[in-house]
Regions:
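Acidic/aromatic/glycine-rich contiguous surface patches that form carbohydrate-binding/processing clefts
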Residues: 212
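Extended intrinsically disordered or low-complexity regions, especially N/C-terminal cytosolic tails and loops
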Residues: 1-204, 216-282
């Protein structure tokens, strides 16, 4: 593993300069604020010429700081969205005369994780296979509450026949996105249409933010832009070029869905964070 002086030497080999921030200050930044791999990762945002990047260390350090603030802000937004959508889904189930809160979960648990592509029809499997899938999916939902192989007493009584209000509370985001899609396909509820389109993109940002992965780096092209997002962006003057960037698509989806499903109080609570972030970008 390179020591801090060797890390700076390596950056110099990449034609990264230390005119704005000198090597002594850069050494301190690498020790206290940003580790080498992550900071160097942002160099890929710049065009490489003659085997080097010819950029200032200060720019990489600033990008890393901005990205950290962006990740913190987006993480809070995705948590707001998750909370608001779980509340909305439970409300819709409660108001649905065809549901009692148990049947929908039982159906969902019987479907394997690839239900959107195969095995959606439980009739194509044996009762034993369906039960195996059900137990596996149920254990997956409650696994982070399982202490030493045993559920807490308050949850244990629900395990055999868990209701929606228990399962949804403890679903991880990926599980909830799958359930949201399942419920929307079953009832085609207009209140969930936009969420069903955007939540897979929101999940991308949540994963990056929660796992400390850069957002404004590795700005790869992606053609999977939902038409809904394109129309929204076009209405507010976002260029087509921006819609070719994967991380931008995911970020825009998060901002749009937050505005769609969260209460005014929650939106206003995040306005200050977004405003400060915008000022920092400038």
């Amino acid at each position: 593993m390179l020591n801090f002086d060797e890390q700076i030497a390596k950056l110099k080999q990449m034609n990264i300069f230390f005119n704005i921030i000198d090597t002594e200050k850069a050494n301190e930044i690498l020790r206290k604020n940003n580790y080498f791999f992550k900071l160097a990762y942002f160099r890929k945002n710049f065009e490489k010429k003659n085997g080097g990047y010819f950029i200032e260390f200060a720019y990489l350090s600033d990008l890393a700081t901005i990205d950290m603030k962006l990740r913190y802000t987006m993480l809070h937004l995705t948590l707001d969205i998750e909370h608001s959508l779980k509340y909305l889904v439970l409300k819709l189930i409660t108001e649905n005369n065809q549901e009692d809160g148990y049947k929908i979960i039982d159906e969902f648990l019987c479907i394997d994780k690839s239900y959107s592509n195969s095995n959606f029809d439980t009739n194509s499997r044996t009762p034993e296979e369906v039960m195996e899938t059900k137990i596996k999916n149920k254990n997956e939902i409650f696994k982070h509450m399982n202490k030493r192989g045993q559920l807490p007493e308050k949850l244990n009584k629900y395990y055999q026949n868990p209701p929606a209000w228990v399962c949804i509370e403890f679903m991880q985001l990926g599980q909830f996105v799958s359930f949201l899609n399942f419920y929307y396909k079953k009832y085609n509820d207009e209140e969930l249409r936009v969420a069903n389109i955007l939540m897979p993109l929101v999940k991308n940002i949540r994963n990056k933010s929660a796992h400390n992965q850069p957002i404004i780096a590795n700005l790869n092209y992606d053609s999977r832009l939902p038409q809904y997002l394109f129309e929204k962006g076009n209405n507010i003057g976002i260029s087509r070029n921006m819609f070719g960037i994967k991380n931008f698509i995911d970020t825009f989806a998060t901002l749009e869905l937050h505005n769609q499903v969260c209460s005014n109080a929650i939106i206003q609570a995040r306005y200050h964070d977004l405003d400060q972030l915008q000022k920092r970008y400038k």
